[in-house]
Amino acid sequence: MELDLALDAAGPWSPEDPSSLIETQTWQITLVDWIQTICADPSLPCPALVCQADEVSLGLRFTDDATITALNSTWRQRNQATDVLSFAALEEAPGLPDVSCVELGDIVISLDTARRQASEHGHNLTRELRWLVSHGLLHLLGWDHPDEESLVAMLQLQEQLLDGGSNVRIRDPHSVDTTVDVNAH
């Protein structure tokens, strides 16, 4: 599978940020690996069109709080910054698109919010951006978290993807002792 990635890495970046975060190839390799990992496990929901495609296409944009607030206000009627927004193309695809290339949609991430969250969680910006990109990707693939159970399953899959993705299995969310904010993402 190939990935046609439209990367808008305009920033705002700081001189301390790893240069790999603005390299298209870095994100292409990561995203293809994650998509193939999900497609390889029939127990994980993923549109068949994606798994059958020779090529997938998506946009990834790194921006600031002001821009993501405007997008969040326009598309979700929430006039506040958020960490990641996803605009899925598959939800609106009429009929059966050409499976040679499937447009997934766009992921928009606020670097300002990502930096704050990385600091709050005690990890680096690279880890936070990988977390947010994986979350956005899952939304593009049809995942959602309207309740705690589905959010826990989604977050578990994100952790497994970030940890290498081998033998991805979602644990029974009822066996997980955790409290999560369903509206956090």
UniProtKB/Swiss-Prot annotation:
InterPro entries: MetalPrtase_cat_dom_sf_prd, YbeY, YbeY_CS
Pfam families: YbeY
Cofactor remark: Binds 1 zinc ion.
Record GO terms (molecular function): metalloendopeptidase activity; RNA endonuclease activity; zinc ion binding
Cellular component GO terms, alphabetical: cytoplasm
Subcellular location: Cytoplasm
Cofactors that this protein relies on: Zn(2+)
Keywords assigned by UniProt, alphabetized: Cytoplasm, Endonuclease, Hydrolase, Metal-binding, Nuclease, Ribosome biogenesis, rRNA processing, Zinc
UniProt-listed Gene3D superfamilies: Metalloproteases ('zincins'), catalytic domain (3.40.390.30)
Family recorded in the similarity comment: Belongs to the endoribonuclease YbeY family.
HAMAP family named in the record: Endoribonucl_YbeY
The protein's role, per its UniProt record: Single strand-specific metallo-endoribonuclease involved in late-stage 70S ribosome quality control and in maturation of the 3' terminus of the 16S rRNA.
Name the record gives this protein: Endoribonuclease YbeY
Primary gene name: ybeY
